[in-house]
């Protein structure tokens, strides 16, 4: 949660390693404050979508981090009810990624073990790109709903 001076966590990463080697590790990334963020799976065996690197010192509609920042600020300003609405807006997408990430991690592990690292990398790259597109779409929908309520 925000400190009195307005500071918050800039991002979070949770590494879900696999002791038995049956799947790849799943790295769950949350941009901005963990209490307001959606966590999405990333795999180092694939290529991250370039849009995730868009940032800068000021707000940009093209930046996922700034979108998460705006959602966080909306939630903090709106209090517990608004935070709950934002979480509910994310829930189906979050639940879907919780369900699909580990299947992808297992499938990619099998492909790599069978010698098809390139195909595994492409599959994971495509998976992360699809998730990122969905995250940006849903996040923008939540923000545009907030803008409509205030106008």
Residue ranges, per PLM feature:
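C-terminus-biased signal that marks the final domain/tail of proteins
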Residues: 1-151
